[in-house]
UniProtKB/Swiss-Prot annotation:
Binds 1 FAD per subunit. Belongs to the ferredoxin--NADP reductase type 2 family. One of its GO terms (molecular function) is ferredoxin-NADP+ reductase activity. It is an enzyme of class 1 (oxidoreductase). Its EC number is 1.18.1.2. FAD binds at E36, K44, Y48, V88, L123, D290, S331. It catalyses: 2 reduced [2Fe-2S]-[ferredoxin] + NADP(+) + H(+) = 2 oxidized [2Fe-2S]-[ferredoxin] + NADPH. HAMAP family: FENR2. Its cofactor is FAD. The lineage of its organism: Bacteria, Bacillati, Bacillota, Bacilli, Bacillales. Keywords: FAD, Flavoprotein, NADP, Oxidoreductase. SUPFAM superfamilies: FAD/NAD(P)-binding domain (SSF51905). Transmembrane segments: none annotated. This is Ferredoxin--NADP reductase 1.
Amino acid sequence: MNREELFDVTVIGGGPAGLYSAFYSGLREMKTKIIEFQPQLGGKIHVYPEKMIWDVGGLLPVTGDKLIEQLVQQGLTFQPEVVLNTKVESIIRNKDGTFTLKANDGKEHFSKTVIVATGSGILKPQKLSIEGAERFEVSNLNYTVKSLKRFKDKTIIISGGGNSAVDWANELEPIAKKVYVTYRKEELSGHEAQVKQLLNSSAECFFHTSITKLIAGDSHEAIEYVELTNHETGEVSHLLIDEVIINHGYERDITLLENSELDVAIIDNFYIAGNANSESSVDGLYAAGDILKHEGKLHLIAGAFQDAGNAVNKAKQFIQPDASEYGMVSSHNEVFKKRNRELIKQMMK
């Protein structure tokens, strides 16, 4: 291993937690690398590019697309090395205390510390388990909502009852011709305010009910009817629809930690068990964002930023024990003086 190949911090995951980790790591003058499985940075926010995000402190409501743009710009401030289309498959602890990260392309990445910021895992939506469903994915069977305009004045059925399903139903209800929601349980499990909004809207909900069949139109290329089955009564009904949206969550990929030789404590067979300082059970390995679990964890994008800052601070002290516990705030940091002057000049034009 060449010393040039050894990074201070390697961040696995390029979503909000990973991008802020990269920014703050650069702020603390550490050589940083981001490894992301997807072909672009941004993480799960790519699933809802037109959704309005309200809960990032100091930001007015912003679309997912715009937030990604700003996060990426900030994350690349200190020019971290970015590796895309790459899956880290295992982490090994070397005799000298550094880490080797083995990727799916056969390459190895070397780092003094690691921050795992993989969120809810590699984005792989749970597909509808109906024979032949995949052929409609090119027409009107959707697992994400990338454009609200696509659904304007259409009759839509959404399968699912969690936060994503409820949020999309609320977003689409004002612009669609009709919105139906079908859920296998007796009540929706999304956030209380959003559930109340949906139940008080024109959307129609079917409980204890699932989509059991997709019926194509004369062209055989798109779904024209869905068959619904009530699991309590056995009643079968059919709905004429234009679009089907499936929100059944995402499959969790836990192979990274399963394949690693590290004794990382796990909660619920997926999450990294940590503490409020983003430390895991392995020295030098930290977690940030949705993958981290501990008592008092804040499950918001804003919480991911705090996780990231804590992880970077601990990584800095792991590498340099006499380093300060926290980085200097940006308003007084010499690193930003030149950048601030340039920004002020632009503002004065």
